[in-house]
Amino acid sequence: GTTFRTSIAENALVGSYAVVNNKGCMVHPKTPAQDMDEIASLLQVPVVAGTINRGNAAIGSGLVVNDWAAFCGLNTTATEITVVERIFQLRRDLGGGRANLLQQLRDTLVDELA
């Protein structure tokens, strides 16, 4: 496998200052644009700088995300949630309302657990 050594906003603990899924990446708000471009190029996903939990720069301490859901701290603001939903592409028009959403979630879980 390939190993990439990097830092995020001059912090070596990249797991605390970045959260990534296969759709996007969110990093420490003081990450230089050049570093964000390098990360985007390495991972082949869009990268955005931001905070979580009402201004916390340690993104990894307050956000867990996968391909279809994100869990964040209770103090996370609406603006922060909007950024999370957009960069990780979590809001999709599923059509058919709540019943269809629940069915799709059930189908996904059953597929993964089968």
Swiss-Prot record:
Taken from the record, one Pfam family name reads eIF-6
Write down what this protein is called. Answer: Eukaryotic translation initiation factor 6
* Alphabetized InterPro entries for the sequence: eIF6
Question: Does this entry carry the keyword Transport?
Answer: no
Quaternary state and interactors: Monomer. Associates with the 60S ribosomal subunit.
Organism whose genome encodes this protein: Trypanosoma cruzi
List cellular component terms (GO): cytoplasm; nucleolus
Q: Give the family from UniProt.
A: Belongs to the eIF-6 family.
Q: Which Gene3D superfamilies match?
A: L-arginine/glycine Amidinotransferase, Chain A
Sorted UniProt keywords: Cytoplasm, Initiation factor, Nucleus, Protein biosynthesis, Ribosome biogenesis
Annotated localization: Cytoplasm; Nucleus, Nucleolus
Which biological process terms from the Gene Ontology are attached to this UniProt entry?
cytosolic ribosome assembly
UniProt GO molecular function:
ribosome binding; translation initiation factor activity
Recite the lineage of the species.
Eukaryota, Discoba, Euglenozoa, Kinetoplastea, Metakinetoplastina
What biological function has been recorded for the protein in this entry?
Binds to the 60S ribosomal subunit and prevents its association with the 40S ribosomal subunit to form the 80S initiation complex in the cytoplasm. May also be involved in ribosome biogenesis.
Main site of residence? cytoplasm
